[in-house]
């Protein structure tokens, strides 16, 4: 049995790093929304029912948009699908703190836009892109790394968010999330010729 190098070329390395960054930030940010409830209730007059509806709509849109982003990835490349999804995700978070964000707009921002963004930035599209760049012998390890980094995002993001909410407030925290998402988008944009 011959052993193969884990990372075959520079493209595989860039793809793995980009996918890990995308999953870390997108799943990490998504995991923190429950921590904002008291601030949404006090400042935006969002009830528990409205917040639950937004999260439910978010999950629905995540599921519905996933196959659409998969089709976009097949036709135009995975990087384009993820970049488009990041546009929706960034807009959703941006409008939550600076745009119209009460009533139906809360559902549009947190439910519709963020949910659509998750359809292309969560685990499925980044994992499929990584799978293309690694040989069968190393593919499961590479994809496991992406999953592990996503789990780390689940772990670290709520801790950071709790700290930031106490010290900076919810608006500033969402602003920082927008920056994180924009950094991921910029990283993808800079390496879009390498990632497919």
Q: Where are the predicted features?
A:
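Extracytoplasmic
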Residues: 15, 21-38, 46-48
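Intracellular juxtamembrane helix-capping segments at the cytosolic ends
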Residues: 120-134
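Glycine-rich segments within core transmembrane alpha-helices of 12-TM secondary carriers
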Residues: 140-158
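Hydrophobic core of transmembrane alpha-helices in multi-pass small-molecule transporters
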Residues: 105-120
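C-terminal ends and interior cores of transmembrane alpha-helices
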Residues: 88-101
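Residue-level signature of mid-helix packing/kink "hotspots" within the transmembrane helices
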Residues: 59-67, 155
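Helix-to-loop junctions at the C-terminal end of transmembrane segments
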Residues: 66-77
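Conserved small/polar residues in nucleotide/adenosyl-binding loops
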Residues: 186-193
């Amino acid at each position: 049995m011959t052993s193969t190098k884990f990372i075959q070329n520079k493209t595989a390395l860039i793809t793995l790093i980009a996918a890990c960054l995308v999953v870390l930030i997108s799943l990490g940010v998504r995991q923190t929304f429950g921590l904002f409830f008291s601030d949404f209730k006090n400042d935006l007059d969002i009830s528990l029912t409205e917040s639950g509806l937004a999260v439910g709509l978010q999950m629905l849109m995540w599921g519905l948009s996933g196959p659409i982003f998969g089709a976009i990835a097949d036709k135009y490349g995975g990087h384009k699908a993820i970049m488009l999804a990041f546009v929706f995700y960034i807009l959703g978070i941006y409008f939550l703190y600076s745009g119209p964000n009460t009533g139906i707009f809360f559902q549009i921002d947190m439910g519709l836009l963020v949910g659509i963004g998750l359809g292309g930035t969560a685990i499925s599209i980044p994992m499929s892109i990584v799978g293309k760049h690694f040989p069968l012998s190393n593919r499961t390890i590479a994809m496991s790394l992406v999953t592990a980094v996503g789990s780390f995002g689940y772990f670290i993001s709520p801790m950071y968010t709790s700290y930031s909410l106490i010290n900076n407030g919810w608006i500033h925290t969402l602003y920082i999330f927008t920056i994180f998402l924009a950094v991921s988008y910029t990283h993808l944009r800079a390496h879009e010729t390498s990632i497919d």
